[in-house]
């Protein structure tokens, strides 16, 4: 029973941190004192569940990474058409950001500006994994469909991910007014016409 309470408290702390990142407080540095107040516990209680604030952010980053990479792997398993795979991965990233504005502050790096450099490195590694997945999709086109792209797959993967990152940054910069998935079908029609 005590184990469940500890797990629930850890989840409660992470949920509160994500909510604070989504609110106006997320636009500035979040302190453990503010977080403890939000959760309704002492700062010491926070540290019974997490050894540092960096570990709290790592908990959210792990959730982001697991959520995105497991779904990207599912797209690999279920979809075989290259352009559909790319579209689905891009939609996944944009929809995840839209549903989780607080976590998008982490993905954009905004919430990590004054935090441990290790956290920014973790986000960079996540984006590198996503870019590698996009590159793999692009390279498999030649094997699956006997076609290649008009530009190098490395450049194309970087461009696709850059488009997503730009949408995420715009979402954060606008205080979540410009939804990342807005007009995606029109945007995709323009993008896919260029890469066919």
Curated annotation (Swiss-Prot):
| Assigned keywords, A-Z | Cell cycle, Cell division, Coiled coil, Cytoplasm, DNA-binding
Chief subcellular location: cytoplasm
One GO CC term on file = bacterial nucleoid
Q: Which biological process annotations from GO are given for this protein?
A: cell division; negative regulation of division septum assembly; regulation of DNA-templated transcription
The places in or outside the cell where this protein is found are: Cytoplasm, Nucleoid
Start-end of DNA-binding region: 31-50
Keyword check for Zinc-finger, yes or no.
no
Coiled-coil annotated spans: 110-139
Q: Which InterPro entries match?
A: Homeodomain-like_sf (IPR009057), HTH-type_TetR-like_transc_reg (IPR050109), HTH_TetR (IPR001647), NO_SlmA (IPR023769), SlmA-like_C (IPR054580), Tet_transcr_reg_TetR-rel_C_sf (IPR036271)
The terms under GO molecular function for this entry are: DNA-binding transcription factor activity; transcription cis-regulatory region binding
Q: Identify the residues that the record assigns to the HTH tetR-type domain, covering every copy.
A: 7-68
Q: Please, which domain of life does this record's source organism belong to?
A: Bacteria
Relate the protein's function as given in its record: Required for nucleoid occlusion (NO) phenomenon, which prevents Z-ring formation and cell division over the nucleoid. Acts as a DNA-associated cell division inhibitor that binds simultaneously chromosomal DNA and FtsZ, and disrupts the assembly of FtsZ polymers. SlmA-DNA-binding sequences (SBS) are dispersed on non-Ter regions of the chromosome, preventing FtsZ polymerization at these regions.
The cross-references to HAMAP family, in alphabetical order and at most eight, read: NO_factor_SlmA
Q: How does it assemble?
A: Homodimer. Interacts with FtsZ.
Into which family does the record put it? Belongs to the nucleoid occlusion factor SlmA family.
Annotated protein name in UniProt: Nucleoid occlusion factor SlmA
Classification of source organism: Bacteria, Pseudomonadati, Pseudomonadota, Gammaproteobacteria, Vibrionales
What's the name of its gene? slmA
């Amino acid at each position: 029973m005590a184990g469940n309470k500890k797990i629930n408290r850890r989840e409660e702390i992470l949920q509160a941190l994500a909510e604070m990142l989504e609110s106006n407080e997320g636009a500035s540095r979040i302190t453990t004192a503010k977080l403890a107040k939000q959760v309704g516990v002492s700062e010491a209680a926070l540290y019974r569940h997490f050894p540092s604030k960096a570990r709290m952010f790592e908990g959210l980053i792990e959730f982001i990474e697991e959520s995105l990479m497991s779904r990207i792997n599912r797209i690999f398993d279920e979809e075989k058409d290259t352009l559909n795979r790319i579209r689905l991965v891009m939609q996944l990233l944009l929809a995840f950001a839209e549903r989780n504005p607080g976590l998008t502050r982490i993905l954009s790096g905004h919430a990590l500006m004054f935090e441990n450099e290790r956290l920014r490195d973790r986000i960079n590694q996540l984006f590198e994994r996503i870019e590698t997945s996009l590159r793999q999709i692009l390279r498999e086109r030649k094997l699956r469909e006997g076609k290649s792209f008009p530009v190098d797959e490395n450049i194309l993967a970087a461009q696709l991910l850059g488009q997503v990152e730009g949408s995420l940054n715009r979402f954060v910069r606008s205080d979540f007014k410009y939804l990342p998935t807005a007009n995606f079908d029109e945007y995709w029609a323009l993008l896919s016409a260029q890469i066919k």
